[in-house]
């Protein structure tokens, strides 16, 4: 006879990731929340859409039924806020590419570093986990 496995509450399990400082797991809930934001970002794959966006960012964003918070995040180029609004970094890469920025630049901005500081941190082996493993535990 096989042993019956205990069911876990997937929502409680995913909530545990919120305890890791700076970690935003792209869940189904985030995907639903950010659907329009991610569709906007994907629209930037077409040159004509990039040109329309650059000509009048606010008006172009109004076509995508974004939440006010998502629109403000895009206009401010606040990638952490965009991720909080359900943005997927791989979709958002279309935005920083439209701005002529690298993935390294965007990742640096999300960690509070310049592109150069971020690059050096990665060359040096990445960020130390000390102090960034648990908000509740303080370690």
Swiss-Prot record:
The keyword Iron applies. SUPFAM superfamilies: LigA subunit of an aromatic-ring-opening dioxygenase LigAB. InterPro entries: LigA_sf, PCA_LigA, Xdiol_dOase_LigA. Its cofactor is Fe(2+). Responsible for the aromatic ring fission of protocatechuate. It catalyses: 3,4-dihydroxybenzoate + O2 = 4-carboxy-2-hydroxy-cis,cis-muconate 6-semialdehyde + H(+). Pfam families: LigA (PF07746). Keywords: Aromatic hydrocarbons catabolism, Dioxygenase, Iron, Oxidoreductase. Composed of two subunits (alpha and beta) in a 1:1 ratio. Its EC number is 1.13.11.8. It comes from Sphingobium sp. (strain NBRC 103272 / SYK-6). It comes from the Bacteria. This is Protocatechuate 4,5-dioxygenase alpha chain. One of its GO terms (biological process) is catabolic process. One of its GO terms (molecular function) is protocatechuate 4,5-dioxygenase activity. It is an enzyme of class 1 (oxidoreductase).
């Amino acid at each position: 006879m096989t042993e019956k496995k205990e069911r876990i509450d997937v929502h409680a399990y995913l909530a545990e990731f919120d305890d890791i400082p700076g970690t935003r797991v792209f869940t189904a809930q985030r995907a639903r929340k950010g659907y329009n934001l991610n569709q906007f970002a994907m629209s930037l794959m077409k040159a004509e859409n990039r040109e329309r966006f650059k000509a009048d960012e606010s008006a172009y964003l109004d076509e995508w039924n974004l939440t006010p918070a998502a629109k403000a995040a895009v206009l401010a180029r606040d990638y952490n806020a965009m991720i909080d609004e359900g943005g997927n970094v791989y979709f958002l890469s279309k935005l920083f590419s439209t701005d002529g920025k690298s993935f390294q630049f965007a990742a640096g901005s999300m960690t509070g570093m310049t592109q150069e500081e971020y690059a050096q941190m990665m060359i040096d082996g990445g960020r130390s986990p000390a102090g960034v493993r648990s908000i509740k535990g303080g370690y």
